[in-house]
Amino acid sequence: MIMFPTSTLFIEGCDLSGKTELIKKLHTTMDYKWHIYDRSQISRKAFNELYNRDIRNIKDDYNNEINNLNNRFVILVPTWKTIEKRFKKRGDEIHNILSLKDVYTKFEDVATSLSGLPNVFIPRYDQANIEDSVIMHLDTQEHSLSLSDISDQVFNAVTYSDELEIYSLSFMIYDDCQFEKADDTILTNEVEGEYYTKIMNSLLKKIDDELSGKNEYDRIESSKSRRFVYTDDSCISFIQVAVRDNVMDFHCVLRSSDVENTFQYDLKFLYFLASKCFDRLELESEEINKVRLRFNLNSAHTVQ
């Protein structure tokens, strides 16, 4: 079973939008399942623009946070009438009604501009229980997505970017060691099959050599070795397999990813390759409780 976990859940919106109340309800209902933050780099960037601040590295900070697809963002956009009513009832430590309207308008624009991102969710504000829709959305994201769904999210993130390139994009998935979606037919892919087979043979040979002591130290490595590595200057440029704390970590760096035409196949291949490494290391699911697959796409792009 594949899991696409939430690393950090950010609750966003203008002042008096209901962020604090939603966070309390999510924590209470889900028993603190998620690491939840009130505001993110989205707010920092919005206020930087609204108040003409000059915050160094803000673009990098913003991109690093939002281009990690395990970070998920909920943006609350109530009606202005709702905000105005709350202000009249309890006021605000910072804003008067005019400055509050400026912030509201800014966050309306922000929500519109980010609404197409795969890790941004904007719940309908006329629902009785917004927390239920957030919980349902996150449960779907974490437990019900296929590899194709995940590669679609990567594609959607890139096509939503101004330059049709994200440099860089990252995400992580877990598997329960059963690798139910591993499919060896990926090796017969018309375009990439030969390339995938070359990578697989190279990494598996490296693992075999290290386990049998065929290295410059004539030293037999264990399953916890740091030396199970594949490197190349092609698009899939780095893979490392390591076992730590009852987890098999499978880390991939792709120097260049055509998310429109090939990444969907790359992801299926790398998932399949992780299953082969698990078998080759003779790991048992009783000893290893999960497999963590980490992906760094240094240039996720569409062909232009």
Describe the residue ranges of each PLM region.
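NTP-dependent small-molecule kinase module
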Residues: 1-3, 92, 105-146
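Hydrophobic anchor at the beta1->P-loop junction of P-loop NTPases
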Residues: 11
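The conserved Walker
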Residues: 14-15
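Conserved glycine(s) of the Walker
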Residues: 18
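Hydrophobic positions on the alpha1 helix immediately C-terminal to the Walker A/P-loop
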Residues: 21-22
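Conserved nucleotide-sensing/catalytic segment adjacent to the nucleotide-binding pocket
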Residues: 28-74
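A glycine- and Lys/Arg-enriched "phosphate-lid" helix/loop adjacent to the NTP-binding pocket
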Residues: 67-112
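Terminal, non-catalytic protein-protein interaction segments that mediate quaternary/complex assembly
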Residues: 136, 140-304
